[in-house]
From Swiss-Prot:
Disulfide bonds: none annotated. Keywords: Acyltransferase, Cytoplasm, Transferase. It comes from Rhodospirillum rubrum (strain ATCC 11170 / ATH 1.1.1 / DSM 467 / LMG 4362 / NCIMB 8255 / S1). Its main location: cytoplasm. It is found in: Cytoplasm. This is Leucyl/phenylalanyl-tRNA--protein transferase. Functions in the N-end rule pathway of protein degradation where it conjugates Leu, Phe and, less efficiently, Met from aminoacyl-tRNAs to the N-termini of proteins containing an N-terminal arginine or lysine.
Length: 213
C-alpha cells in the first residue's frame, strides 16, 4: 500500500479527487471523484432574512485558524443521528500536516470560551475545498459558512467545492454539477491565487458584493 503524504494529497485535490474512509475506525482511504460534484457558487449563497439578523447581531465570536485540530476532531465526532464518520485518523493526521503547511484552514464560532461550531478545508489557488462542518448550537455552522464565503469573495477565490450536497448545504445554495464541468472550473480556479488571510471587516457587505463567481 502506498503511503499518502501531504504532497500526494495536494496533487490529488488538484486533479479533482479526494479521500474518504468508510468509518472512523477504518484505516483504509478511498479516492473519490463523483459523477456529480457539490459546489456552492460564491454569489449564490442563500442568506435568509433571519440569518441576516443573526449575522448583524452575531451571538458568536468568529475566529480563523486558531484551533484547527479541535475543529477537525469535532467534525469527526459522532453526534445524535450520525454515529459514524468518514474522517479517520489518517485524514486527521494529513490535514493537520496541511494546516502546518499553511494550506489547511478553519473557521471557528465561539460562545464565551466554548467552541460551538465551525468548519475546515483546504485552500489551493483560487479554490477552497470544504471538508466538513459541525454545530453544537443553532446557526453556528451557518454563521461559519457565511464567514467562509465572505472571506473567499474578499480574497479573490473562484470556487467553493463542497464535494457532495446535503439538505443543509442545498438550503444554503449548494448545487451539483457534472464531473467534466467541475474539472474545467477546478482547472481555471487553480490558476488564480486567492488570499485566505484577507481582512473582512463587514461580512454582510462582502456577501452582498458580486464576485462574478
Amino acid at each position: 500500500m502506498i503511503s499518502i503524504t501531504p504532497e500526494i494529497l495536494v496533487r490529488a485535490y488538484a486533479s479533482g479527487v479526494f479521500p474518504m474512509a468508510r468509518a472512523h475506525d477504518d484505516p483504509q482511504l478511498y479516492w473519490i471523484d463523483p459523477d456529480e460534484r457539490g459546489v456552492l457558487p460564491l454569489d449564490g449563497l442563500h442568506v435568509s432574512r433571519s440569518l441576516r439578523k443573526v449575522l448583524r447581531h452575531c451571538p458568536f465570536t468568529v475566529t480563523i485558524d486558531t484551533v484547527f485540530v479541535e475543529v477537525l476532531k469535532q467534525c469527526a465526532a459522532p453526534v445524535p443521528g450520525r454515529d459514524e464518520t468518514w474522517i479517520n485518523a489518517e485524514i486527521e493526521h494529513l490535514f493537520t500536516d496541511l494546516f502546518d503547511l499553511g494550506l489547511g484552514h478553519s473557521v471557528e464560532c465561539w460562545q464565551g470560551d466554548q467552541l460551538v461550531g465551525g468548519l475546515y478545508g483546504l485552500a489551493m489557488g483560487g479554490v477552497f475545498f470544504g471538508e466538513s462542518m459541525f454545530s453544537r448550537v443553532d446557526n453556528a455552522s451557518k454563521v461559519a459558512l457565511c464567514h467562509l464565503v465572505a472571506r473567499l469573495k474578499r480574497g479573490g477565490f473562484r470556487l467553493l467545492d463542497t464535494q457532495f450536497t446535503t439538505n443543509h448545504l442545498r438550503s444554503m445554495g449548494a448545487v451539483e454539477i457534472a464531473r467534466p464541468l467541475y474539472h474545467a472550473r477546478l482547472g481555471n480556479a487553480l490558476q488564480v491565487m486567492g488570499d485566505f488571510t484577507v481582512d473582512v471587516p463587514d461580512v454582510l457587505a462582502a456577501l452582498d458584493t458580486p464576485s462574478g463567481y
